[in-house]
């Protein structure tokens, strides 16, 4: 058991089906305006909306994405050699990546490994936001080792996808 290392499984996050669309639309508008100004810190209103959306009650029926990530986490946990595993989300779901990391730091973890469910390059979350969070965490907590297991090898992803095809759609026998 490794009581000094933890893993954060990061999912994109999605808004629950029963949340008022106007709430999410306002959040996305404020986020877009902030990003256009190249400002990192949220306004008080954006932070309030972000918290409200992330903490919205969820069920498998209203947010199958979050429960899908949790299912992956449950399957991944026994494969991590005793490392603690938590989930986090880039947007819409709690906890945020930053909050998940802060919780682990407060619990005394010395090494935190981040891995994303987002496999492809080019996405703002996996390619820009998460590396930015790593940089900020290292500055804030220089004694904590934070690593991001990304990008994924294209050949590895291709093998994974080919295996899934073979499993889900068996080749007919001649």
Each PLM stretch: what is its role?
Residues 1-174:
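Active-site-proximal alpha-helix that buttresses catalytic centers in soluble enzyme cores
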């Amino acid at each position: 058991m490794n009581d000094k290392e933890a893993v954060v499984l990061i999912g994109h996050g999605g808004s629950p089906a029963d949340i008022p669309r106007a709430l999410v639309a306002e959040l996305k508008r404020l986020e877009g305006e902030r990003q256009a100004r190249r400002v990192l810190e949220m306004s008080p209103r954006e932070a309030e909306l972000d918290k409200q959306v992330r903490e919205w009650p969820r069920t498998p029926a209203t947010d199958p994405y979050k429960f899908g990530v949790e299912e992956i986490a449950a399957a991944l946990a026994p494969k991590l050699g005793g490392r603690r595993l938590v989930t986090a989300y880039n947007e819409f779901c709690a906890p945020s990546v930053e909050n998940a990391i802060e919780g682990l730091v407060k619990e005394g973890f010395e090494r935190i490994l981040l891995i994303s469910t987002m496999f492809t390059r080019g996405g703002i979350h996996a390619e820009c936001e998460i590396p930015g969070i790593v940089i900020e965490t290292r500055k804030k907590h220089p004694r904590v080792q934070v690593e991001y297991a990304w990008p994924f090898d294209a050949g590895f992803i291709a093998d994974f996808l080919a295996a899934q095809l073979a499993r889900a759609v068996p080749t007919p026998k001649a």
